[in-house]
Amino acid sequence: MKNFRVTNRNKIVKLFLGSFQFSVVIVLLATLMTTMTSAQVNIKVGGGLGVMTPASDLGGSTMEYYNGTNYGLSGGLNIHAKAKIGLVGFNLTGEIDYSSLSNSGNSEPGQGAVDISQKILSLKIGPEFRLSMPVVPIVPYLGINLALNSFSGETTFQGVSKVPSATYSVNSATRLGIGFAAGAEVSIGPLLSLDFNLSYNLMNVSGKEWNDVNPGINQRIDSYLSLNDASDPLYNFDDDKHFVSKARSIQSVLFTVSVLFGL
């Protein structure tokens, strides 16, 4: 019980520190950018749909997920809301993304059924630097953002040899990340535009950790009950209960189309 309280206290402290760091950066960035110019700003808000494709260790197969090498997810849909504050030469952009990823397959060749689902909620803020194209109603841009990413989901094992058959919830986890974007905003009216955006997202740059939700019990299933993007501190080559040997990088490619309304 003592270890459980300490573990949860550490999780709360880490989450608070991560959220505090993110908030400080947002405030400083917003203050800096709004004081860089005294020109009148323009504001656009809207939202849209997109497609997220896993990259690095976020993708792979269900067998790789079962073996602890990556998360075994395939592509999924994204919905989002976006706001832009237009300043001289750049936009200050904020975005809320919700993406749903999943995959199904075997735990071993021809054996065991595994269904994985992952939900990712991301809060992003950063500048977009506009590239001038006179006369043409298209404004290309390059952007960078700081992101606070929240992960949750569930996994179902059926007929898997080393894990009891059941559906398991995955503990939510929060990580800080960075994204790089390129896009174009196409004007289709005085106060209406379409925003096409392609971004590459490093989603767990900061905050990787290993969380054993049942520290008093030595069982394989615990490795799947949290995000566990750090290596298992109890990893042993011959131990089938502690098999995650290295930290895992969570990255993605996201393509979105947004409808923006000028205010």
Model-derived features: positions:
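Transmembrane beta-barrel strands of outer-membrane/channel proteins
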Residues: 45-53, 92-98, 142-148, 184, ...
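Extracellular loop and loop/strand-boundary signature of outer-membrane beta-barrel proteins
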Residues: 59-69, 107-117, 162-170, 241-245
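Gram-negative (and chloroplast) outer-membrane scaffold detector with strong preference
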Residues: 82-163, 171, 252-263
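Gram-negative outer-membrane beta-barrel proteins
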Residues: 51-61, 100-108, 148-156, 202-210
